[in-house]
Design a protein with these regions (language model features):
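Substrate-positioning beta->alpha
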Residues: 96-102, 116-140, 146-147
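Active-site "gating" loop of Rossmann-like NAD(P)-dependent oxidoreductase/epimerase domains
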Residues: 5-6, 35-58, 74-78
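Active-site Tyr-X1-5-Lys
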Residues: 56-84
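Mid/C-terminal beta-alpha module of Rossmann-like enzyme folds, strongest
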Residues: 137-194, 224-231
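NAD(P)H-binding glycine-rich loop region in Rossmannoid oxidoreductase-like domains
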Residues: 1-12, 17, 21-24, 39-41
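C-terminal amphipathic/interface module of NAD(P)-dependent oxidoreductases
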Residues: 196-232
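Short-chain dehydrogenase/reductase
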Residues: 6-12, 47-50, 58-66, 90-93, ...
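Flexible, glycine-rich beta-alpha linker
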Residues: 81-102
Length: 232
């Protein structure tokens, strides 16, 4: 499809061409922002990915990112270019899109929200500031060479906790009440939003212990500070 061609052109082909150009011009290190989408969707009971988890992308975005990783690794062997791969989960900050933007909009509306029951799921995310800080560390740390790093805020949140943070920093008067999860799933089926509802209800966690240990790094920005900055 056209979409598939665009994903592979942008995420794979252009990335590989840029890396080849960098190597030919004497650039020493190449940091590639991949995605946890290379793991595919979490399948309960396994909802936590770590540095040793097998890759199994389930959409063209994840496939194109993984293909770029493989080709960059080959370029590193051929040219000596120091390649570092970072796999972030959802990245959030000002201008965030997707489900985070939707939740923010709902909370701003001050309408009652049926998400209180989604309080036991866990979602790993990373603020833009924490991601940038990790990239800075990877630029200079010799232990980063040839590594694949997962990144997050190291503070996983439930959907209910995310809504509470939005409420706090937006000054929202929305009441959050409980609706059984099966009703939310049914709404997703009826409205054709199954994947969006799944992302709201299910867990998806990344373990960043390898990143923290290898680079002696921890996320400098707290989740509270990140949310406060996001809704300014």
């Amino acid at each position: 499809s056209d979409d598939e061609q665009v994903y592979f052109h942008v995420n794979t082909h252009l990335t590989v061409e840029l890396a080849k150009m960098a190597a030919s011009r004497g650039v020493k290190r190449f940091i590639y922002l991949s995605s946890t989408k290379v793991f595919g969707d979490p399948v309960p009971p396994v909802v936590c990915f770590n540095s040793g988890s097998p890759t199994n992308p389930t959409d063209v975005y994840g496939e194109s990112k993984l293909q770029a990783e493989l080709e960059l690794t080959a370029i590193a062997k051929e040219t000596g270019l120091e390649v570092v791969i970072i796999r972030p989960p959802l990245v959030y900050g000002q201008g965030v899109k997707g489900n985070m933007a939707m939740l923010s909009k709902l909370v701003r509306s001050n309408l009652p929200l049926p998400f209180r029951a989604i309080s036991t799921n866990r979602r790993s995310m990373v603020s833009l500031e924490n991601l940038i800080d990790l990239v800075r560390h990877c630029l200079s740390n010799p232990d980063a060479i040839g590594q694949i790093f997962l990144v997050s805020d190291d503070h996983d949140l439930s959907t209910f906790e995310i809504i509470c943070l939005f409420k706090r920093y937006l000054g929202s008067k929305s009441i959050v009440f409980s609706v059984p999860k099966y009703i939310l799933y049914a709404i997703g089926c009826i409205t054709g939003s199954t994947s969006k509802i799944n992302r709201l209800v299910e867990s998806s966690v990344v373990d960043i212990e390898h990143t923290k240990t290898t680079l002696n790094w921890s996320p400098p920005q707290s989740v509270e500070e990140a949310f406060k900055n996001m809704v300014k």
